[in-house]
């Protein structure tokens, strides 16, 4: 019987899983932001129709796009998300103790909740704005 599979979100702690997300990444060779280097910096590739080079840190959820071939992924990550705890980890993920891993994952979960809460707040504010405009038009 084989080892049980890791939960999908925990798989992203492993660099090879992050590399696998860079299927149609535009920068493959002779550049600083190859899939391997992007994955080392904690990024996964999550392209959209309008942003084919969109990458997101799986840990702090910072999204960056508009990559240039000479962009250094770790430097860009530090510049745009200096508080990301993933960047401070000095060990390979496989070398972390269970306690270290769970502490790290607790921070990732907090980041995810903060991101989702922020997105919901923006969505609510946009709905409130639209509703307010509709009410004002009725009153006019």
From Swiss-Prot:
Gene3D superfamilies: Inhibitor Of Apoptosis Protein (2mihbC-IAP-1), Chain A. Residues 113-129 have a biased composition (Basic and acidic residues). The modification Phosphothreonine is found at residues 34, 48, 117. CDD domains: BIR. Ubiquitinated by the Cul9-RING ubiquitin-protein ligase complex, leading to its degradation. Ubiquitination is required for centrosomal targeting. Deubiquitinated by USP35 or USP38; leading to stabilization. Acetylation at Lys-129 results in its homodimerization, while deacetylation promotes the formation of monomers which heterodimerize with XPO1/CRM1 which facilitates its nuclear export. The acetylated form represses STAT3 transactivation. The dynamic equilibrium between its acetylation and deacetylation at Lys-129 determines its interaction with XPO1/CRM1, its subsequent subcellular localization, and its ability to inhibit STAT3 transactivation. Pfam families: BIR. Its main location: cytoplasm. BIR repeats lie at residues 18-88. GO terms for cellular component: centriole; chromosome passenger complex; chromosome, centromeric region; cytoplasm; cytoplasmic microtubule; cytosol; interphase microtubule organizing center; kinetochore. Residues 130-140 have a biased composition (Polar residues). Keywords: Acetylation, Apoptosis, Cell cycle, Cell division, Centromere, Chromosome, Chromosome partition, Cytoplasm, Cytoskeleton, Kinetochore, Metal-binding, Microtubule, Mitosis, Nucleus, Phosphoprotein, Protease inhibitor, Repressor, Thiol protease inhibitor, Transcription, Transcription regulation, Ubl conjugation, Zinc. Residues 113-140 are annotated as: Disordered. Disulfide bonds: none annotated. Multitasking protein that has dual roles in promoting cell proliferation and preventing apoptosis. Component of a chromosome passage protein complex (CPC) which is essential for chromosome alignment and segregation during mitosis and cytokinesis. Acts as an important regulator of the localization of this complex; directs CPC movement to different locations from the inner centromere during prometaphase to midbody during cytokinesis and participates in the organization of the center spindle by associating with polymerized microtubules. Monomer or homodimer. Exists as a homodimer in the apo state and as a monomer in the CPC-bound state. The monomer protects cells against apoptosis more efficiently than the dimer. Only the dimeric form is capable of enhancing tubulin stability in cells. When phosphorylated, interacts with LAMTOR5/HBXIP; the resulting complex binds pro-CASP9, as well as active CASP9, but much less efficiently. The BIR repeat is necessary and sufficient for LAMTOR5 binding. This is Baculoviral IAP repeat-containing protein 5.
């Amino acid at each position: 019987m084989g080892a049980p599979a890791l939960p999908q979100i925990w798989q992203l702690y492993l660099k090879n899983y992050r590399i696998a997300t860079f299927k149609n990444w535009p920068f493959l060779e002779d550049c600083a932001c190859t899939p391997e280097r992007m994955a080392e910096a904690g990024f996964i590739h999550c392209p959209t129709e309008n942003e084919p080079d969109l990458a997101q840190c799986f840990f702090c959820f910072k999204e960056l796009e508009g990559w240039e071939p000479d962009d250094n992924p770790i430097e860009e990550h530090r510049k745009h998300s200096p508080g990301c705890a993933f960047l401070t980890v000095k060990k390979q993920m496989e070398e972390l103790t269970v306690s270290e891993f769970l502490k790290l994952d607790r921070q990732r979960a907090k980041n995810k909740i903060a991101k989702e809460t922020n997105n919901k707040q923006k969505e609510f504010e946009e709905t409130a704005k639209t509703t307010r405009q509709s009410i004002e038009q009725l009153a006019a």
